[in-house]
Regions:
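C-terminal helical subdomain
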Residues: 194, 211-264
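Catalytic loop of short-chain dehydrogenase/reductase
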Residues: 90-125, 136-187, 199-202, 209-211
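Conserved Rossmann-fold cofactor-binding substructure of NAD(P)-dependent oxidoreductases
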Residues: 61-78
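Conserved glycine-rich Rossmann-like NAD(P)H-binding loop of the short-chain dehydrogenase/reductase
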Residues: 23-41
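Rossmann-fold cofactor-recognition segment
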Residues: 47-64
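Hydrophobic structural elements of the Rossmann-like NAD(P)H-binding subdomain
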Residues: 85, 144, 192-195, 205
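N-terminal Rossmann NAD(P)H-binding glycine-rich loop of SDR-like oxidoreductase domains
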Residues: 11, 15-20
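Conserved SDR Rossmann-fold cofactor-binding beta-strand/turn motif
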Residues: 34, 191-201
Length: 264
């Protein structure tokens, strides 16, 4: 029996790899949601001529566009969806690594944090809200939100990570929003979880493969923080999918890790 997946944030990086791997499953129907369909070159190349992948355009910041995308998915899926994977996030190259001290002024810090919150935190709320009618109509009722151990206070402190300020704070809010949804939906048989992929080198598809600063940051983390192991998207998503496929209602509200190094 076909299993339907919607991957929000599928144009590059981890989301793109989700689509690639899911598309190889003969019983999977994949709905890839991207902010800019014309600009999703890596996705277009990956899914060319694949009949089980459908691409739709929506921005998680714009709840109306997410609702339109959900209706477009429903028109193909018969109004149902089995699994929602929320990967959309704000990862803007070197800027994402900034700590409080790295901003020129408070206005710049405020703007960065607000923008990150809209995408990373409110985007989760918008995504789940839009696809909830389809998930309710389906038998599986799984929601996986991509989180990060970098949003867990004791991990941040133990590893000595004062940077990633806007990203980490907004992802912490996203993980809390996921917990709220897990509570709200538990009596309906849903399984709503956060999933931390660990340290994944996505530079080949996010436009930063030639940025020496980003490469150095990844190498430094890999070297100085042995709790994290730098993985490829293929390695990470392979494990993530095993976790997603094994989820059951008893796992509702959980935080799972796909990477070798658990929290410090």
């Amino acid at each position: 029996m076909p299993i339907s997946y919607a991957v929000v944030g599928a144009s590059r990086g981890i989301g793109l790899e989700y689509v690639r791997q899911l598309a190889t499953h003969p019983d999977a129907v994949v709905f890839a949601i991207v902010r800019n369909k014309k600009g999703s070159f890596h996705l277009a190349a990956a899914v060319a001529n694949l009949k089980n992948v459908h691409v739709f355009e929506a921005d998680v910041v714009d709840h109306a566009s997410m609702e339109r995308a959900a209706k477009e998915v429903a028109a193909i899926s018969g109004g149902k969806l089995d699994v929602l994977i929320l990967n959309a996030g704000r990862m803007s190259g070197e800027a994402v690594w900034k700590g409080f001290k790295d901003y020129p002024n408070m206005d710049a810090l405020d703007a960065d944090c607000i923008d990150a919150f809209k995408i990373n935190a409110l985007g989760v709320v918008h995504g789940i809200t839009a696809f909830l009618p389809l998930l309710r109509a389906g038998p599986t009722k799984k929601i996986a939100v991509l989180g990060t151990d970098g949003a867990i206070p004791n991990t941040v402190y133990a590893l000595g990570l004062p940077d990633l300020s806007a990203y980490s704070m907004s992802k912490a809010a996203a993980m809390l929003a996921t917990a709220k949804w897990a509570l709200q939906l538990k009596d309906e048989g849903f399984t709503v979880v956060t999933l931390a992929p660990g340290l994944v080198d996505t530079t080949d598809t996010v436009g930063t493969s030639g940025d020496p600063t980003v490469k150095k940051i990844l190498q430094d983390i890999d070297k100085n923080h042995p709790a994290f192991v730098l993985e490829t998207p293929e390695q990470s998503v392979k494990v993530q999918l095993k976790i997603v496929d094994s989820l059951k209602p008893a796992d509702n509200g959980g935080h799972f890790r796909s990477h070798p190094g658990n929290q410090a």
